[in-house]
Amino acid sequence: MVGYIGNVDIGVFDAEVANSMSAELERQNTLLQMIASENFVSRAVLQAQGSVLTNKYAEGYAGSRYYCGCALVDVVENLAVERLCRLFGCKFANVQPHSGSQANQQVFMALLKPGDTILGMSLDCGGHLTHGAAPNVSGRWFNAVSYGVNRDTGLIDMDEVEALALSAKPSLIIAGASSYPRRIDFAAFRAIADKVGAYLLADIAHYSGLIAGGCYPSPFGHAHVVTSTTHKTLRGPRGAVIMTDDEEIHKKIRLSVFPGMQGGPLMHVIAAKAVAFKEALHPDFKLYAQQVLENSRVLAGVLSSEGLDVVTGGTDSHIVLLDLRSKGVTGREVSSSLERAGIVCNKNAVPFDTEKPWVTSGIRLGSAAETSRGLGVPEFESIGRLVAKVVNACSLGQEKMSAAEAEVRREVNGLVRSLPMSAFPVCEVC
């Protein structure tokens, strides 16, 4: 019999991967994780995702699989669907999409045909690649028209949305964003969609945890269909879901997901989604969402008081977007400097940005992950001052920038040492 290495620990069998995992744990533990699309999952979510369910192939849906031996994974998928519907108060849900981008594509496939017109937010004003950006499938398969924000306020220009909808007659309108910090008026979007006979897709990838926690407007009752990732403010594994109250749309989406765009679902990830949904149904999750919002508003306030340009002047979500043009520095420069100082964020386009996407004129900060770590208002006040110190130093030359980075790094070390992430060990070497 050929020897099987299935019972060998990763630290023994593959030290290179094990060491990388340990190093990544150390990185997450010792730096402030301020990327708005990231969060820290619980030990229970990690246990589900690292379970034996990864061994099971289960093409199809619960009760209608193409493989035998699926009775137990059916239980898991049904739990995920039931919990998700209960969490958002929707009638139908599909928990199989592997990612948010795929979920959006699956909606397009279900409701549109190539060449149809879609109306979504432009990338530089806060939209996502899948909302019609030229390099993306959504911008290549469809006639993509983009709306933006008011140049003075930074808020979505609903008059422009309506004018574009009336002239372009889109088949689908997308309400959602990846770097828009304010509330989205889903009811107003639906009214416009109804005027032109369009479907309304709400992409709540960034806001879903806040919606579940009652801290952000819900699209349900307005949008025909809703997509979300599960790993941002919802604090679950990397993946996505599609929800609707319309049974006919639900049936089309089922076929679009499988067999349209995916084969076997990732049952270990669906199990982790089910666990995350149960966590989000707990009363404590509302407190978490409230703290995420309070922390981001405190952060925005401190940054503004330190003389930095906060896009829209504040936030209604976990996102804080900084426009760096008045400082004469780029998002790439500042995000790199902040990382050296122990604060991890991402460079980001700001409204009407003229820099290249890999340079940008802004940075995006998020409060979700560090709120999960346990940081509150005092810590986020400190983080705001530390970010401002680095940003201001970036325009003063290499020597002052390096000095600021070193000073801030020492303060970050003190913050993270007081609140290590205890949920993370997933193997002996980690």
Curated annotation (Swiss-Prot):
This is Serine hydroxymethyltransferase. Catalyzes the reversible interconversion of serine and glycine with tetrahydrofolate (THF) serving as the one-carbon carrier. This reaction serves as the major source of one-carbon groups required for the biosynthesis of purines, thymidylate, methionine, and other important biomolecules. Also exhibits THF-independent aldolase activity toward beta-hydroxyamino acids, producing glycine and aldehydes, via a retro-aldol mechanism. The lineage of its organism: Bacteria, Pseudomonadati, Pseudomonadota, Alphaproteobacteria, Rickettsiales. The record marks 231 as: Plays an important role in substrate specificity. It is found in: Cytoplasm. Keywords: Amino-acid biosynthesis, Cytoplasm, One-carbon metabolism, Pyridoxal phosphate, Transferase. GO terms for biological process: glycine biosynthetic process from serine; tetrahydrofolate interconversion. The modification N6-(pyridoxal phosphate)lysine is found at residue 232.
